[in-house]
């Protein structure tokens, strides 16, 4: 589905990125009709023109094949500068690799992401173990530039590549009894050193969940790439969820299981500290974390003398698109 964020989130692509990159992208788009005939390295090179300076990385054949008809800039973010690739890939929360922001970039290469399968089960007509090629055979790869707001009060703007979550839901045909979708991260102690730590408080594997209407919302994305490339391991390769109106911990990484369930799943952070992390985790500047305010955020990159602090927007700036999902709820209680 082609989504265009209206006035609250739309802009011309030249407003989101430096002119040199913008012009390079326009040259790419003008030649897109020929891209479908290219395969392998030439096609990756064309995709790389989207973001000059981003290091090349190997990509599986199914991903390369999807680049030919990718829908670039399907969603943009008004007046926002894209976070530099180095910041987006070197400052991460991914506790399976360690508690520090640099641990995922340092250790995530130990995770083997090829081959990769996802178990789909629960209240669904087409359960099974699917490869990523199976899941996205019919889908068109889309680039979506989303704001990412961490519950720790920092934020980024990231150009994701992926497929609408709703497409997968419709493909596997959940039964009417399914009211929620439960997601599970890989648990591989031999490859994820953070899970071997005796100091880790998390009951692995990491679990997240959405209501069915949230999963079906057009903004919900299953990401397989970013910055014109395949997802780096530290950012959740090879498959992660992106729900831009929720705090970042809802956007679960390295997904190996998607279950359609009757009851609201007990999610990881909710289980660990329910008074601090609710199931919904919608970005809300009026509902503070018990230990800090959520009214403002630090947009990365920043520095000691230029911290780049700004006001946080309700639903991370996507209120026009998602507020109706919660019209009957008290957002100060259902957080």
Predicted regions located by residue number:
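Acidic/proline-rich low-complexity IDRs
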Residues: 1, 42-43, 66
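N-terminal export signals
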Residues: 27-50
């Amino acid at each position: 589905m082609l989504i265009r964020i209206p006035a609250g989130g739309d802009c011309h692509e030249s407003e989101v990125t430096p002119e040199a990159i913008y012009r390079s992208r326009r040259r790419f788009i003008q030649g897109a009709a020929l891209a479908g005939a290219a395969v392998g390295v030439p096609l990756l090179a064309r995709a790389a023109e989207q973001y000059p300076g981003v290091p090349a990385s190997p990509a599986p054949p199914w991903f390369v094949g999807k680049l030919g008809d990718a829908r670039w800039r399907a969603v943009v973010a008004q007046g926002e500068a894209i976070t530099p690739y180095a910041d987006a890939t070197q400052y991460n929360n991914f506790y399976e690799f360690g508690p520090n922001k640099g641990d995922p970039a340092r250790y995530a290469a130990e995770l083997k992401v090829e081959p990769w399968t996802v178990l789909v089960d629960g209240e669904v007509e087409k359960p099974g173990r699917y490869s990523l090629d199976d899941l996205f055979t019919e889908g068109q790869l889309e680039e979506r530039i989303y704001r990412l707001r961490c519950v720790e009060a920092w934020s980024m703007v990231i150009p994701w590549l992926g497929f609408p979550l709703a497409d997968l839901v419709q493909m596997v045909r959940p039964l009417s009894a399914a009211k929620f979708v439960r997601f599970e991260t890989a648990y591989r102690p031999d490859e994820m050193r953070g899970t071997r730590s005796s100091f880790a408080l998390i009951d692995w594997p990491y679990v997240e969940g959405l209501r069915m209407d949230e999963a079906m919302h057009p903004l919900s994305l299953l990401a397989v790439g970013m910055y014109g490339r395949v997802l780096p391991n530290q950012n959740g390769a090879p498959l992660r969820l992106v729900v831009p109106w929720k705090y970042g911990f809802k956007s679960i990484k390295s997904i190996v299981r998607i279950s359609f369930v009757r009851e609201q799943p007990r999610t990881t952070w909710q289980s660990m500290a329910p008074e601090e992390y609710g199931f919904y985790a919608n970005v809300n500047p009026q509902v503070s974390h018990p230990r800090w305010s959520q009214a403002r955020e630090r947009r990365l990159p920043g520095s000691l003398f230029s911290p780049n602090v700004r006001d946080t927007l309700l639903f991370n700036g996507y209120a026009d698109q998602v507020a109706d999902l919660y019209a009957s709820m008290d957002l100060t209680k259902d957080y």
